[in-house]
């Protein structure tokens, strides 16, 4: 009788075969990416050719180190291991390494990052800064030992001696180079005495120049407050740093020339030219002034200067005469005015008015005293009357005269209408009180 296997048993057997097969532990596979949708962590997709499809998985740690992004339809070469997934009975390849087929991964990464940064606008011309005409101090981010810094120092010293060069020794290739380049660009921007920044290195392979294609370097250049000149590799080499920099130079020497657009000889020639122009201008002015002075010295005014102020002397005499007449008239008018005001003041003397007001004040004082005495006597009589009335209302005085006061619940009873049968009342008398109960209520007929 045949023995039947369970699906689980068969699947486990196949998985064991897959796991132990040396040919499936490390598989070199080429195929086209299909059904790819980028996920935040692990990537799941298919690899296919014209006749077959296999499921593929890249764990997040591996994917982040690829250096390029997978795209739908991209043909890639991968290295991985084949495994069976028991719950579905399917098999797939777990990719450990991948690179684009035919084109290097760095070239793919270059184009992908270039596209991304272009869409963000980092390469737009409107963000480019103008280079200064005259720089007092230039920062250079490059290797300490390379020919780049020597060429820059030589060229700047030749073109404009006295310009300071501040070197930021930097690792320009290999692991950690991009971070160091970006860090030194940021350091240079923290100084207030730098006018310009040159970044660069000598020629090399795309791998050697790759640090200048890293996103961290591109963004550091874009965010630089200082204008940046890039000089990376040879003239045929192009990096993303060249796209984002304010100017690109094919060589370090060309970069130094861009950093010093005006040479010391240019300045000296300009100063000499300006000196000549100033001398010519001064001579022309002197010549014109001398000619004008000559004409003035020959004029009637210079030959007979008294004619210049004869008319003014006559005018001065007339003004002095008019001033004297005006002062006499003004003094006479003011004297008459003072006399008139003095007479008015005598007529309006306040002595009489003051005496009259004093007499009136004495009369009012006497009248006020008599009126206050009358009011006081009236108020005293009123107080006495009210005091006597209050004494009449004093309950102790009422009961002392032999009367009694009836109270119900602390209220004085002044009418039988406020009482009813069996009410409890208190009778206040001269020497005490009595608690009583109402037996009957009779109303007095009026």
From Swiss-Prot:
The keyword Transcription regulation appears for this protein: no
EC class: hydrolase
GO biological process: DNA catabolic process
E.C. numbers: 3.1.11.6
UniProt keyword Cytoplasm, yes or no: yes
Superkingdom of origin organism: Bacteria
Pfam families (UniProt xref): Exonuc_VII_L, tRNA_anti_2
InterPro entries on file: Exonuc_VII_L, Exonuc_VII_lsu_C, OB-fold_nuc-bd_dom
Catalytic activity: Exonucleolytic cleavage in either 5'- to 3'- or 3'- to 5'-direction to yield nucleoside 5'-phosphates
Subcellular location field: Cytoplasm
Chief site of localization: cytoplasm
UniProtKB keywords: Cytoplasm, Exonuclease, Hydrolase, Nuclease
Any one GO cellular component localisation term in the record: cytoplasm
Family: Belongs to the XseA family.
Function, as annotated: Bidirectionally degrades single-stranded DNA into large acid-insoluble oligonucleotides, which are then degraded further into small acid-soluble oligonucleotides.
Protein's recorded name: Exodeoxyribonuclease 7 large subunit
UniProt source species: Streptococcus pneumoniae serotype 19F (strain G54)
